[in-house]
Swiss-Prot record:
Annotated source species: Chlamydomonas reinhardtii (Chlamydomonas smithii)
Catalytic residues as annotated in Swiss-Prot or TrEMBL: 261
Protein name per Swiss-Prot or TrEMBL: L-lactate oxidase
The protein's enzyme class: oxidoreductase
Annotated binding of pyruvate, by residue: 27, 132, 167, 261, 264
Any one Gene Ontology BP term: response to other organism
Statement: the UniProt record of this protein carries the keyword Hydrolase: no
Subunit structure: Homotetramer.
Coiled-coil segments on the chain, per record: none
EC number from the UniProt entry: 1.1.3.-
Cofactor: FMN
C-alpha cells in the first residue's frame, strides 16, 4: 500500500523521487539550461507577505470558484502535463478521476498516454483539452472536433513551445517512453515512434518529435482559424509579455494563462507570478474582463492566495499532481489536492477572508528581505 502520510506538496516530491525511475523524475522535475527559471517560479512567492484582517466572521469559509461556467471546489485547476504514464500505470485516467473526486477541473495534454475517449469515460464533467499546434491542420481540426464532441469544456492552446527548450537532463538520459506506453493522440503520426527510439547521438526522442511536428511558424492568425472550427472557449497558455496579452485580447481569446512552461522553455524568463500584475493591467486596460490564470511554483495554499491577490482569476497546479500520482496513483493525487484545499481554506480564514471574492491586493505587502518585488501602488498602500 502506498504511503500517503506526506503533509505538504514539497514532501510529496521527496517521496516521488524515491519511487520513480531517474529518467521519469528528471523529466518532470528539471527545466531548461541552468534551470534558473524553475527556481525563480518558486522563490517569487517569498517576495510577498500576507497582511491579515481580524474580527471577521470566518466560521464558514467558501473556497469554491467558477470560470468559463466550470465549477471548482477551489480556485485551482490541474495543469496540462505530458505522459502521466511515466509516473503511474493509471496514467491520465487516474489523475482525471482524482480531480473529479476533488471537484477540480482537469486539463488533458495533447502529449498524453491516455486517449480522449478514456478521459471522457472517467465521467469527470469539467475537462479542458490542451492543444499543441502541429503543422498538419487537419490533424489539429480532428483533435479539436473530437474534444468538443466528447464534452470537453474549453481549449487551452500552448503558445510557448513552438520549439522545445534545451532540457539537458532529457538529452543526458536519452529520454524515451518505456515499453507499453504510447502517445495516444499522436499514434497516427508517423513521427510518434521517435519518442520511443533511443539514439546515442541525438539524445531525447521527445525533442525529435517536437522538431518534426510542432508548427514553429505559428502566429496570432491561428486564433481566428481555430475560432472557425470550434465553439469552445479558447484559452491561450504561455504568455508573459503585457504586449502579447493586449494582442490576445485583440484576437478575441477567452482567457489567458500567464506561464513560462514550468521553467522548461526559455531559461531566465520571469516567473508567471512576477508578470501577473502587468498582464492583468494590460488586459483590463483594453477594456476586457477575460480571466487571467497563472501557473508555476505553486506549493502552498498561501501561494494560491498571493496569486489571487495579485489579480489572478485562478491557478494551475502542475508537478505536485504528478508526484502524487507517482507515489499513490489516484489516491496520491486526491491527497495532494485535499492538502492544498485544506491549506487554502485555513489560510483564507487566518487572513480574514470567508470567500474567494474577498481576496484582493489589500492582503499583500512586499517582503523586506526576500529580494525585490514589484512596487505597490500608493492607493493600495493607503488601504492597509
Amino acid at each position: 500500500m502506498a504511503d500517503l502520510s506526506f503533509l505538504n506538496l514539497e514532501e510529496v516530491e521527496e517521496e516521488a523521487k524515491k519511487v520513480m525511475p531517474k529518467m521519469a523524475f528528471d523529466y518532470y522535475s528539471t527545466g531548461s539550461d541552468t534551470c534558473y527559471t524553475v527556481g525563480e517560479n518558486r522563490s517569487c512567492f517569498s517576495r510577498y507577505l500576507l497582511l491579515p484582517r481580524m474580527l471577521r466572521n470566518v466560521s464558514r469559509v467558501d473556497t469554491s470558484h467558477e470560470l468559463f461556467g466550470i465549477r471548482s471546489s477551489m480556485p485551482v485547476w490541474v495543469a496540462p502535463m505530458a505522459m502521466h504514464g511515466l509516473a503511474h500505470p493509471g496514467r491520465e485516467v487516474a489523475t482525471c478521476r482524482a480531480a473529479a473526486a476533488a471537484g477540480v477541473p482537469f486539463t488533458f495534454s495533447t502529449v498524453a498516454t491516455s486517449s480522449l475517449q478514456e478521459i471522457q469515460e472517467t465521467g469527470h464533467d469539467n475537462r479542458i483539452f490542451q492543444l499543441y499546434v502541429i503543422r498538419n491542420r487537419e490533424v489539429v481540426r480532428r483533435w479539436v472536433t473530437e474534444a468538443e464532441s466528447r464534452g470537453f469544456k474549453a481549449l487551452m492552446v500552448t503558445v510557448d513551445a513552438q520549439r522545445l527548450g534545451n532540457r539537458e537532463a532529457d538529452a543526458r538520459n536519452k529520454f524515451t517512453l518505456p515499453p507499453g506506453l504510447a502517445l495516444r493522440n499522436l499514434e497516427y503520426l508517423s513521427s510518434a515512434s521517435t519518442v520511443q527510439a533511443r539514439d546515442s547521438q541525438d539524445g531525447s526522442g521527445l525533442m525529435k518529435l517536437f522538431t518534426s511536428e510542432v508548427d514553429d511558424s505559428l502566429t496570432w492568425e491561428f486564433i481566428p482559424w481555430l475560432r472557425g472550427v470550434t465553439k469552445l472557449p479558447i484559452i491561450v497558455k504561455g504568455l508573459l509579455s503585457p504586449a502579447d496579452a493586449e494582442l490576445a485580447v485583440q484576437y478575441g481569446v477567452d482567457g489567458i494563462v500567464v506561464s513560462n512552461h514550468g521553467g522548461r522553455q526559455l531559461d531566465y524568463a520571469p516567473s508567471g507570478l512576477h508578470m501577473l500584475p502587468a498582464v492583468v493591467a494590460a488586459v483590463r486596460g483594453c477594456g476586457s474582463s477575460i480571466p487571467v490564470l497563472v501557473d508555476g511554483g505553486v506549493r502552498r495554499g498561501t501561494d494560491v492566495i498571493k496569486a489571487l491577490a495579485l489579480g489572478a482569476s485562478g491557478v494551475l497546479l502542475g508537478r505536485p499532481v504528478l508526484y502524487g500520482l507517482a507515489v499513490g496513483g489516484q489516491a496520491g493525487v486526491e491527497r495532494v489536492l485535499q492538502l492544498l484545499r485544506s491549506e487554502i481554506e485555513l489560510s483564507m480564514a487566518l487572513a480574514g477572508c470567508s470567500s474567494v471574492q474577498q481576496i484582493g491586493p489589500q492582503l499583500l505587502l512586499p517582503a523586506p528581505s526576500a529580494g525585490p518585488a514589484p512596487p505597490m501602488p500608493a492607493a493600495q498602500l493607503c488601504k492597509l
